[in-house]
Structures are given as structure tokens and as C-alpha cells.
């Protein structure tokens, strides 16, 4: 009996610690990008997956202690996919006492009618879903639309665009919507997926399967996701360093003439961003930028990234 109580206390301690980390990550993202302002009405897009459940939970938690007042309304789009458990989200949200709206639109039928069997349906489905959510935000008087993409999603998108699209383009934590009428925010931008997975399991959220439409997963994105997970296991800190790099861009040391006036450099021009350090031996920090070891991590020396000097 004592052993059970001991385990329960430890589980609660770990859950509290995890929730504090997620809350801190979300709070920092909100502050860094001015995501939420006084009087905002936030439309929280709830899919029934781990990410959106976590986003709603953390925003509700922050709402109680934030120095500003803002309201939340959860929105789920029932796309009439076969087997969709339409009772789960209303029951969950009513239990929490959260204002919500279930939008019923048969986008599944439209996609099946327009897209030939065997072809990818995700592109059309996304466009339809986006338009419905924008319309719903207007109807509800929402000032911001919150999506549940996290740090790993942002990095995956960056590598997808680099590997397949020839662009250095990620997924912004805050942006103006396609129709120019709504501000979209991603409060989980600084949150690690593995933290969200653990939090969702500990909270026992009623997860709704994401493959009800029968579509295949994005294989290219899956390859990138597997690559990042492998790096995270083999080289602790690499993911954090890459995300830090997205926040420390030096246009003068890249090749985009739209971001920096290379043609304007002439004799007498001032040195920009340290000039050319290509021939200098660069000091590699022992601890990867942006990485904070967990309490149960082994020694920092053992976890140091492998550094290969290119000559």
C-alpha cells in the first residue's frame, strides 16, 4: 500500500514538473511573439489529438494567472468522416466547463467526390478546413486562432522545405491568415513533442484517431520526423541547437539577395556581422546552444555532440 502511495506521489510530482515546463514554454512563446493581448478572444482549434488537448489545457492554466484578461472558445470541425466519435469532445468540454462550438461540414464527402481514388486528399481537405475555420472565427468574434503545432512540427517543416522545396522556410509562431483577416498563433511553438506525449498520457486525454479519413501519412514528413528523433537520441541537444538557429539568422552570411544587398558591397563598405570568419577556427561550445539537460541526464561530456572539423 505504501509502495502504491509512493508511486502515486512520484507520478504526481513528475506531472507537475512537466506541466510547469510546458506552461513556461508556452508563456515564453506568447511573450516573445505577442501572441495574446488584453481582451483577446482565442479560438482554440481542437482536433482531438494530443497537441490540441495540451494546448487547451495549458492556455486554461495560464488564463487563471496571466496579467491580462482573455477568453477561450474551443472549436472542432466534424468533417463527417466514417466512424468519427462525435460524442467525445462535447462530453469532455462540458465536463471542463469550456465554451465550445462543433462545426459540422461534410468536407469528407466533397474530397471523395473531387479526388480520384488512390490520390492524396490532404491538400484539398486542408484548404476546405482552413476556409471553414476562418469563417467560424469571424462568426464567433475571435481575435486570434490558436493551432497546436509544436517545436518538432516547425523543425520538420523547415527540413521539408530545404530538402524538397529548395527554401529555408519553416512554420511561423504567429502570422496573418491567408484571407488577411485573422491572426493565427501557435502557442506550443517552444514545446517538445516528447513532453506533449508524456503530458497527454499522464492526463489521459480522450484521444481521437487521426486516420479516420483513410488518408496515408505524409511519407516525406515521416522520414524527416524519424531523422529528427534519431538525432535527438544519438546527439542530445542537436534539436535544441537547430531550433535556436532559426532564431539567430544572419542574412549577410547566406545567399539570398532579397535579404541582403551583396551587390552593394564595395571598397570602403563597413564590415557586417563580423566579416569573413571562414579561415578562423571556430570555437564549438561544450553545451549545444539552447539545450538544458534533464535532471536524469548523464554527464555533459558523454552527451556532447560529435564535431567533425572539415579541412
UniProtKB/Swiss-Prot annotation:
GO terms for biological process: tRNA thio-modification. Pathway: tRNA modification. It catalyses: cytidine(32) in tRNA + S-sulfanyl-L-cysteinyl-[cysteine desulfurase] + AH2 + ATP = 2-thiocytidine(32) in tRNA + L-cysteinyl-[cysteine desulfurase] + A + AMP + diphosphate + H(+). GO terms for cellular component: cytoplasm. The thiolation reaction likely consists of two steps: a first activation step by ATP to form an adenylated intermediate of the target base of tRNA, and a second nucleophilic substitution step of the sulfur (S) atom supplied by the hydrosulfide attached to the Fe-S cluster. NCBIfam families: PRK10696.1. This is tRNA-cytidine(32) 2-sulfurtransferase.
Amino acid at each position: 500500500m505504501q509502495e502504491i502511495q509512493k508511486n502515486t506521489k512520484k507520478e504526481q510530482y513528475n506531472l507537475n514538473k512537466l506541466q510547469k515546463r510546458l506552461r513556461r514554454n508556452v508563456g515564453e512563446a506568447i511573450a516573445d511573439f505577442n501572441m495574446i493581448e488584453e481582451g483577446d478572444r482565442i479560438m482554440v482549434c481542437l482536433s482531438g489529438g494530443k497537441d490540441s488537448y495540451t494546448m487547451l489545457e495549458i492556455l486554461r492554466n495560464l488564463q487563471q494567472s496571466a496579467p491580462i484578461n482573455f477568453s477561450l472558445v474551443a472549436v472542432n470541425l466534424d468533417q463527417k468522416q466514417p466512424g468519427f466519435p462525435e460524442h467525445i469532445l462535447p462530453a469532455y468540454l462540458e465536463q471542463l466547463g469550456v465554451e465550445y462550438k462543433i462545426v459540422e461540414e461534410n468536407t469528407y464527402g466533397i474530397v471523395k467526390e473531387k479526388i480520384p481514388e488512390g490520390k492524396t486528399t490532404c491538400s484539398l481537405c486542408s484548404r476546405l478546413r482552413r476556409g471553414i475555420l476562418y469563417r467560424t472565427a469571424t462568426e464567433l468574434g475571435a481575435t486570434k486562432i490558436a493551432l497546436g503545432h509544436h517545436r518538432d512540427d516547425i523543425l520538420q517543416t523547415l527540413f521539408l522545405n530545404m530538402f524538397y522545396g529548395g527554401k529555408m522556410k519553416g512554420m511561423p509562431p504567429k502570422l496573418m491568415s491567408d484571407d488577411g483577416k485573422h491572426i493565427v498563433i501557435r502557442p506550443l511553438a517552444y514545446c517538445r513533442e516528447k513532453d506533449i506525449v508524456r503530458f497527454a498520457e499522464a492526463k489521459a486525454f480522450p484521444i481521437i484517431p487521426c486516420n479516420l479519413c483513410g488518408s496515408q501519412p505524409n511519407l516525406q514528413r515521416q522520414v524527416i520526423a524519424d531523422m529528427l528523433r534519431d538525432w535527438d537520441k544519438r546527439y542530445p541537444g542537436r534539436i535544441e541547437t537547430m531550433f535556436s538557429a532559426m532564431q539567430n539568422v544572419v542574412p549577410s552570411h547566406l545567399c539570398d539577395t532579397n535579404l541582403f544587398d551583396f551587390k552593394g558591397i564595395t571598397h570602403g563598405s563597413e564590415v557586417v556581422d563580423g566579416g569573413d570568419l571562414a579561415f578562423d577556427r571556430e570555437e564549438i561550445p561544450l553545451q549545444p546552444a539552447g539545450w538544458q539537460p534533464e535532471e536524469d541526464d548523464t554527464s555533459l561530456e558523454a552527451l556532447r555532440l560529435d564535431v567533425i572539423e572539415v579541412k
